[in-house]
Amino acid sequence: MAHKKGTGSTRNGRDSNSKRLGVKAYGGEPVTAGSILIRQRGTSVLPGINVGKGKDDTLFALTDGIVTFETIRRGLKNRKRISVALTS
């Protein structure tokens, strides 16, 4: 017979590192070319004018300007689109 109680196992005890997703530049904010606007998984926000999309779906500014958000109708859903308006 065991003279000390064996330790049990658990299925918990793991936690992934946060990925710091979300909006990095809000509407009306001035940005420079190359600035990250949104980090996302999938295209929950679509790229608009003067906005590029990276391979991990990150949206970034292609030119200097002011960030603008708009809602567009795409199929049966309303989607958000982010653009960078040029400053004159």
Swiss-Prot record:
Question: Which Pfam families is this protein grouped with?
Answer: Ribosomal_L27
Q: Which GO terms describe its molecular function?
A: structural constituent of ribosome
Alphabetically sorted, this entry's keywords are: Ribonucleoprotein, Ribosomal protein
Using the UniProt annotation, give all residue ranges assigned to the region (Disordered): 1-26
The cross-references to InterPro entries, in alphabetical order and at most eight, read:
Ribosomal_bL27, Ribosomal_bL27_CS
Can the keyword 4Fe-4S be found in this entry's annotation? no
Q: Name one GO cellular component term.
A: cytosolic large ribosomal subunit
Q: Which GO terms describe its biological process?
A: translation
- Family, per entry: Belongs to the bacterial ribosomal protein bL27 family.
What NCBIfam families does the entry give?
Answer: L27 (TIGR00062)
- Protein known as: Large ribosomal subunit protein bL27
Q: What is the lineage of its organism?
A: Bacteria, Bacillati, Cyanobacteriota, Cyanophyceae, Synechococcales
Gene symbol here is rpmA
